[in-house]
């Protein structure tokens, strides 16, 4: 659904300022929740605002932030969306049921009744580039709208190291063993409350694939010059594929 009030300009997006909203929203300064600062520009969360005479602004879906410009506002928008979801899900204490409040010092929700403290939800997940010489394993998801090739990926389980997550996900999804697990880089992915961590690893043994058809529609080995991929500014998966294709890893 629609979620964020935006102004769309020829050169990108913009958010409303307090001066745009204050005439129609008398308590906006008391109700605004500070989110974060980017290059000395402060961002706040304001809900249930009146926008009767704000014809230049529209309510937009979170997907608008995938390709919006400038990138720092797109990042601010989707990160604010993630925090808004977390605040909505933490209005009341899960331990005693009393109302929670924003802590004055930390990004945290606090229950004054029982002392419970809740921090933002961040789910660790891995993206895995399984390689075998000059070949990389690429897959397509089963039953999802996204139909392009991707790398293997999955969430970390409780009690598991990140390296164990890599080994388990590869075994579960394609039935292969891997070795020489190497960290590449990370990326926050606020669309799903996730912190993505990219790894490359080498095939350990035979390359015959045993596909988990509930998770994947297919999985194939591609040589560097055969890899089907196009540049994408916001995808760690895409970046890892291109790095391998160009012989940089």
Regions found by a protein language model. Give the residues of each.
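Cys/His-rich short segments
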Residues: 79-131
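The catalytic Nudix box helix
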Residues: 150-185, 199, 203
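Active-site-adjacent beta-strand/loop module that shapes the phosphate/pyrophosphate-binding cleft
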Residues: 187-210
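Nudix hydrolase/Nudix homology domain
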Residues: 1-90, 145-149, 191, 212-249
């Amino acid at each position: 659904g629609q979620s964020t009030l935006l102004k769309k300009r020829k050169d990108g997006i913009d958010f409303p300022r307090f001066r745009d909203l204050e005439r129609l929203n008398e308590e906006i300064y008391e109700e605004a929740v500070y989110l974060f600062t980017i290059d000395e520009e402060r961002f706040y969360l304001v809900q249930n605002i009146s926008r009767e005479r704000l014809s230049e602004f529209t309510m937009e879906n979170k997907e608008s932030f995938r390709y919006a410009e400038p990138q720092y506002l797109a990042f601010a928008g989707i990160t604010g969306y993630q925090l808004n979801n977390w605040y909505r899900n933490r209005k009341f204490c899960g331990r005693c049921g009393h109302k929670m409040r924003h802590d004055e010092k930390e990004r945290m929700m606090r229950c004054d009744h029982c002392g419970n403290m809740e921090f933002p939800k961040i789910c660790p997940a891995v993206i895995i580039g399984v390689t075998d010489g000059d070949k990389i394993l690429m897959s397509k998801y089963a039953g999802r709208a996204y139909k392009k090739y991707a790398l293997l990926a999955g969430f970390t389980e409780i009690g598991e190291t990140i390296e164990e997550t890599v080994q388990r996900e590869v075994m579960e999804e394609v039935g292969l063993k891997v070795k020489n697990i190497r960290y590449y880089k990370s990326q926050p992915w606020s669309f799903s409350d996730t912190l993505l961590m990219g790894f490359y690893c080498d095939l350990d043994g035979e390359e015959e694939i045993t596909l988990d058809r509930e998770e994947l529609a297919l999985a194939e080995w591609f040589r560097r010059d055969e890899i089907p991929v196009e540049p994408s500014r916001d995808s760690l998966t895409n970046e890892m594929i291109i790095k391998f294709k160009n012989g940089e890893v």
